[in-house]
Amino acid sequence: MSNFEKVKEFNDAFNTSKVKEFNKDVFDTHPDMINLCLSLIKEEVEELEDALLNKDVVETKDALADILYVVYGMQYRLGIKGDNDFSIVHNSNMSKLCNSQKEAEETVEYYENSFKTGSLSYDTPYFEKLDNLNKWVVKNKSTGKVLKSINYTPVKWTD
């Protein structure tokens, strides 16, 4: 059972309100449900901020799990297929990796040129090989941020 399915089980057990199919009308037809879900998410993010400020390991773990729980819950209640959407985003994120050293070199060159022209702020792009995946990752050294390959595939959502 996936985490999304566990949260679905919880929501079904407690008979929480939900919509049958996600569409833009839900914002007008179910504002109370949306506001409740959003307030739960905000509450859990605030708890995470407090836990991090206090360097509280237990409360950090709790808050992170609770954030996932309330986000999955909102997806379910809005009629969004959480596991499906997560897989779509995951596949897009994995396309940030480069399939060859040549692609990694070209990606670094792209970011270097973009920094010089001022169109992007990544000042120290570099790549490293991920032997476990036989892929290359491009990162910005000064921030540690993973950068997108020149062949990155963004998510294409439909309504």
Model segments located where?
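Flexible "arm" and connector segments at domain edges
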Residues: 1-64, 68-159
